[in-house]
Amino acid sequence: MSEIFDAKAFLKTVTSQPGVYRMYDAGGTVIYVGKAKDLKKRLSSYFRSNLASRKTEALVAQIQHIDVTVTHTETEALLLEHNYIKLYQPRYNVLLRDDKSYPFIFLSGDTHPRLSMHRGAKHAKGEYFGPFPNGYAVRETLALLQKIFPIRQCENSVYRNRSRPCLQYQIGRCLGPCVAGLVSEEEYTQQVEYVRLFLSGKDDQVLTQLIARMEKASQDLAFEEAARIRDQIQAVRRVTEKQFVSNAGDDLDVIGVAFDAGMACVHVLFIRQGKVLGSRSYFPKVPGGTELGEVVETFVGQFYLQGSQMRTLPGEILLDFNLSDKTLLADSLSELAGRRIHVQTKPRGDRARYLKLARTNAATALITKLSQQSTITQRLTALAAVLKLPAIKRMECFDISHTMGEQTVASCVVFDANGPLRAEYRRYNIAGITPGDDYAAMNQVLRRRYGKAIEESKIPDVILIDGGKGQLAQAKAVFAELDVPWDKHRPLLLGVAKGADRKAGLETLFFEPEGEGFSLPPDSPALHVIQHIRDESHDHAIGGHRKKRAKVKNTSTLETIEGVGPKRRQMLLKYMGGLQGLRNASVEEIAKVPGISQGLAEKIFWSLKH
């Protein structure tokens, strides 16, 4: 590789999620592996003018390529970073210690057990959880546990000599067992058991027990206690939703696929003993017009059946694409491996979340690859040439979304010379039209958007109308009737009709509503920018429509009850532990809430029941 690494173009494609990055030199050798809570922020730091050290300068000078693997938590990134360092032994990494010196979380065997970090021999009485990749991972986990399960983390010397609780008790990070009377033995023991289960990966048992306690507290009308337990349940759920380590110690290969602009990315996550060991993105050569199913099927067959990967076959392969010959593939792999290999395409639970992670990484890698091949500037330049324009400095695109004509929303997205200008994206609620009339919806949104004064810098060079000839005719009619102070003839109106079976790459473009349109090659940078802005508009419209539909569906019945304002609504939900608790309450129980009369309680009761 002799080309200079384009850091600016690369950083535009990097996500702000946690993950791991690998840096390669001109020979394709991994020279550094790192992890980050925010990949974009961390990687940007390498390309500043004032670098922190000569080592970093020497490293950056040799970078020819960077791969990133997105993870869902920083802890997962730490584990993955460690596995990559062990695998590649990069010369710019400090090599970590071997497993025998790794830190553990220690739950002591004291009367009031404490949590702490432990290294070395395991002589002390208590339980050890780990090992963790480094001390930072342990400290991060301890801080998390302290927020959810407030058992003590202080040294025994401090614990034995306190006469009043410390600041940790005041801010809710410790139950204060050091001072008699602050917490019962039963409650402290219960929280210790939650910690034990949580660190053992038994999150479901923790949630089951907490939910049972919350329901009992609600039945006993101990609403403050129920609310505290509810907050604890929510905290546990927030954490467990982000954990992607299987309790079953599974051996899996998880294959996610992304396809865009004539290019495919197949991302494989390798999971052994329930832990993500690493991942890799593959970019198979895809002839024009190839179906995505064929891409996946061919790749999987070559990847596993050519022999080099056979000895690493897992017990299960997860795919995010439903293969027509799934059974044949599974039988062939099983025969080669001498044991049963399962191929799943619709997994649930942890497996579904692994698949989502693989899909996320595939999409991220593909975005980076496409960006490296053709930047947004190059694409806009190519489109300007196709449209015979001197330049395209601003481009706007419209789309309509509704369900059976209801909750119609129009979207407008804006691109400038640097790509998406999300601060200027707009949604328009469409009203006063015949349900399902997309032409009327397009007519309305264009009049609202352009039937007023517009700054010179915000007049678009191109207006893309998603929908083909009919929608383009509406746009032409609207612009013909506009009476505005700006040059309404400046924007070029361009219609785009989806191809047969709505396949990307087969779009037809129209300058006029009459006559034949024209198409661009699937690998055309001009077509890629059209697809990009159209997809952004489509997603923006659908997002707005879903929010509007959800608002109608989920508007609390309480908001429609006369006499129940925001303060009373908040009081009701607080005392009843949420809307479900209120629905289950009797008139007498509702009337006990401060500020709620017997008459209003009856009105609330019957409104919720009917």
Swiss-Prot record:
GO terms for molecular function: DNA binding; excinuclease ABC activity. Keywords: Cytoplasm, DNA damage, DNA excision, DNA repair, Excision nuclease, SOS response. Residues 204-239 form the UVR domain. Signal peptide: none annotated. InterPro entries: GIY-YIG_endonuc, GIY-YIG_endonuc_sf, GIY-YIG_UvrC_Cho, Hlx-hairpin-Hlx_DNA-bd_motif, RuvA_2-like, UVR_dom, UVR_dom_sf, UvrABC_protein_C. One of its GO terms (biological process) is SOS response. GO terms for cellular component: cytoplasm; excinuclease repair complex. Residues 16-94 form the GIY-YIG domain. It is found in: Cytoplasm. Belongs to the UvrC family. Interacts with UvrB in an incision complex. The UvrABC repair system catalyzes the recognition and processing of DNA lesions. UvrC both incises the 5' and 3' sides of the lesion. The N-terminal half is responsible for the 3' incision and the C-terminal half is responsible for the 5' incision. This is UvrABC system protein C.
